[in-house]
């Protein structure tokens, strides 16, 4: 079981040690070493097929749900290998929450979208207070407070995504993973999500996959650039790898790798 050190979150770190991920015989990502610091927003960027979403899903064992997906190496959270057989993956996903690319509210009321997960995770406090505080943290309370009994589907796309963020917050995670959370949203909704992320950073560590370079520059403290190279066997397949990891300021102003510069300047993608 992962030890609970919520009160000392600033000391937390999520570490990947020589992580390689495969789908059957296809190796998607190879030899990733990376540290995610507590309290940071970290962006994972890179061209399609470089494995950044695969790596993101590995951080809370969502890849376990994909047939024939396997991981070599170690993923440490609070010093515990989350892939140890003694670790409950459901507990991992509670402590490290996920917001997906497409808004996916439950087919329930707005209120129950928040309350349902908290209830099955054993919450015994004031549910009304939890619902309100979660919706406030996700910056959607003012738009929902008068229609909590309406379906989550009645909200706009941007509101639905913030509802999903609130739903994640309600089960009290310590890290929030976001897989291109704004890709299906309009610019105004995207701005609201980004503003929400800046507020959430005060209490949560956030790791986000994005194809939007300006978004990475606006929201993140650290940026990891993933790229892909052809297999040594020369069969035309490619494997992803972590090409560069540094502060967002350095990645976008003075990257060490030529490929990083070429990617952020739009020469490939």
Swiss-Prot record:
- GO biological process terms, semicolon-separated: phosphate ion transmembrane transport
ABC transporter domain segment(s) = 14-253
NCBIfam families, per the entry: 3a0107s01c2 (TIGR00972)
The reply on keyword Membrane is yes
Q: What is this protein called?
A: Phosphate import ATP-binding protein PstB
Q: Where in the cell is it found?
A: Cell inner membrane
* UniProt enzyme class: translocase
Q: Which CDD domains match?
A: ABC_PstB_phosphate_transporter (cd03260)
Gene name, per UniProt, is pstB
The Gene Ontology CC terms held by the record are: plasma membrane
* Pfam families tied to this protein: ABC_tran (PF00005)
Top-down, what is the taxonomic lineage of the species of origin? Bacteria, Bacillati, Cyanobacteriota, Cyanophyceae, Synechococcales
Free-text function comment from the UniProt entry: Part of the ABC transporter complex PstSACB involved in phosphate import. Responsible for energy coupling to the transport system.
An example Gene Ontology molecular-function term: ATP binding
Mainly localized where? membrane
Membrane topology type, per the record?
Peripheral membrane protein
Q: Is this entry keyworded Cell inner membrane?
A: yes
UniProt keywords (A-Z) are: ATP-binding, Cell inner membrane, Cell membrane, Membrane, Nucleotide-binding, Phosphate transport, Translocase, Transport
User: Subunit notes for this chain?
Assistant: The complex is composed of two ATP-binding proteins (PstB), two transmembrane proteins (PstC and PstA) and a solute-binding protein (PstS).
List the InterPro entries hit by this protein, alphabetically.
AAA+_ATPase (IPR003593), ABC_transporter-like_ATP-bd (IPR003439), ABC_transporter-like_CS (IPR017871), P-loop_NTPase (IPR027417), PstB-like (IPR005670)
